[in-house]
């Protein structure tokens, strides 16, 4: 299986970043396309109720994906640092432990949700009207979530192993299969929401299998390995996973921010505008993961370069990489904002007939929502930087600001001040406030020498005592 020749310590930073960024971006956009394709076919095959039903289920998927991103990001940072020090076996052990852990974490709640789909749907905020559709979607979608969490973790590892194009291929396979099966199951077969869920499940399983097969048999430096099992080994396993989760916690919080955004937005739109409002917000929520993945692609493309050179102690390459990443974030954010500002009707029309009440609400709301996209991407990039140099506290703090500290109050206060536009402006204001906080933090570090000198980061103190 072909790999890219990538030397993280000597190649010029910009070409190196580009080599990671382009396939990572394409792969991540393909991952976002999986649920968006569901929405497009369901919108035309079932209607706005189908979109609303899927949107109610998505926060749970975001939570599972977030756990995968947390472990994957933490594992990737640890493995990068260990590889920079020549400790490839320690890196392999961390990778294997990470995948074992997420398998257990995904399997147990998935089984519970499959056993109690109605209770799960009601817990997520489904109305009685939408309940049958939400149950159908959950029943057929949940079984694939173990594979989804495998994909979330494995793509970090595959890129670090020097195969960013293969990581992109895993995502493309998932998206292509989903497009074909969505059309087949929703239109010729007439299976509606259930067909969309079944198509997505099959496509996710295919992508997950490709990723795991690579790590089992074809990986160059990070192939999965056998683990020892003893009381001491289990203690070390728990400690290593705890360290990975600590480093990657901000990645989980980033995904949790999307879940909070969708869950809180669903409740507020239901309160102010009913099912049509949820359907309109559902269209926005189909696009939000694309924006999230742009920011995530920038952060994840910079992460191997930053973490590896951080492990080597090469601060100049670390700073250069972050400058390139932030500039990329600003450019990408401006492009995305322009698209949503000038062509909302085109974007909404992919999902619903523009005469639909939900579509009309969405056309008016998307330009307001798009005000926050540049800040959204910048914040993800900045949080990814802190995560890559093992600065857990600022990474976690800024992720919490986006997801809880600012977002929830904005959803509560702004609609009371300005009605429906206030709901759309909640996310942008939250992201702007977070960006301001990050800038102030950077300025404080820059102009406070004592504080700056204490911020060199720390590698895993237990690196030499892995299982």
Where are these regions (language model features)?
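Short alpha-helical transmembrane segments in multi-pass integral membrane proteins
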Residues: 1-21, 79-144, 188-249, 306-372, ...
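N-terminal transmembrane alpha-helices
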Residues: 8-46, 59-74, 78, 103-110, ...
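Transmembrane helical elements of multi-pass membrane transporters/channels
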Residues: 19-38, 140, 151, 174, ...
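Transmembrane alpha-helix boundary and packing residues in multipass membrane permease domains
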Residues: 24, 28, 40, 77, ...
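Residue-level hotspots within the lipid-embedded alpha helices of multi-pass solute transporters
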Residues: 28-32, 66, 106, 110, ...
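Helix-terminus/linker motif at the lipid-water interface of multi-pass membrane proteins
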Residues: 33-51, 121-128, 184-191, 252, ...
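Small-residue-rich hydrophobic transmembrane alpha-helices
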Residues: 51-111, 148-167, 270, 280-342, ...
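Short runs within selected transmembrane alpha-helices of multi-pass transporters and secretion channels
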Residues: 72, 141-159, 167-178, 196-212, ...
């Amino acid at each position: 299986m072909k790999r890219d020749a990538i030397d993280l310590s000597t190649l010029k930073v910009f070409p190196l970043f580009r080599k990671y960024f382009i396939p990572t971006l394409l792969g991540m956009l393909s991952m976002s396309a999986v649920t968006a394709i569901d929405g497009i076919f369901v919108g035309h095959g079932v209607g706005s109720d189908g979109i609303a039903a899927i949107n109610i289920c998505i926060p749970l998927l975001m939570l599972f994906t977030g756990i995968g991103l947390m472990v994957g990001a933490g594992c990737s940072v640890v493995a990068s640092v260990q590889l920079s020090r020549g400790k490839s076996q320690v890196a392999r052990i961390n990778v294997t432990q990470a995948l074992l852990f997420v398998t257990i974490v995904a399997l147990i709640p998935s089984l519970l949700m499959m056993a109690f789909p109605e209770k799960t749907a009601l817990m997520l905020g489904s109305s009685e009207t939408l309940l049958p559709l939400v149950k159908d979607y959950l029943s057929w979608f949940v079984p694939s979530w173990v594979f989804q969490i495998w994909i979330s973790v494995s793509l970090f590892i595959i890129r670090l192993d020097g195969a960013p194009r293969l990581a992109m291929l895993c995502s493309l396979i998932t998206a292509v299969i989903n497009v074909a099966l969505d059309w087949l199951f929703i239109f010729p077969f007439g299976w509606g929401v259930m067909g969309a869920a079944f198509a997505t499940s099959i496509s996710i399983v295919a992508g997950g299998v490709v990723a795991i097969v690579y790590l089992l048999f074809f990986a160059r430096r990070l192939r999965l390995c056998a683990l020892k099992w003893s009381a001491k080994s289990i203690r070390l396993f728990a400690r290593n996973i705890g360290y990975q989760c600590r480093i990657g916690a901000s990645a989980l919080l980033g995904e949790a921010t999307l879940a909070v955004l969708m869950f809180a937005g669903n409740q507020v739109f239901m309160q102010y505008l009913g099912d049509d409002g949820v359907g309109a917000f559902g269209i926005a929520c189909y696009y939000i993961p694309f924006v999230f993945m742009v920011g995530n692609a920038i952060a994840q493309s910079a992460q191997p370069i930053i973490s590896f050179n951080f492990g080597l102690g090469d601060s100049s390459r670390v700073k250069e990489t972050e400058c390139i990443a932030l500039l990329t974030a600003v450019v990408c954010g401006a492009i995305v904002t322009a698209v949503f500002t000038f062509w909302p009707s085109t974007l909404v029309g992919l999902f619903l007939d523009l005469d639909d009440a939900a579509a009309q609400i969405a056309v008016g709301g998307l330009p307001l929502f798009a005000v926050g996209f540049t800040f959204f991407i910048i914040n993800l990039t900045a949080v990814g930087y802190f995560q890559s140099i093992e600065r857990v506290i600022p990474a976690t703090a800024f992720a919490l600001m986006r997801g809880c500290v600012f977002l929830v109050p904005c959803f509560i206060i702004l609609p009371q001040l300005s009605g429906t536009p206030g709901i759309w402006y909640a996310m942008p204001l939250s992201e702007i406030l977070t960006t301001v906080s990050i800038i102030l933090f950077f300025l404080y570090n820059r102009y406070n020498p004592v504080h700056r000198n204490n911020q060199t980061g720390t590698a895993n103190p237990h690196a030499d005592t892995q299982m």
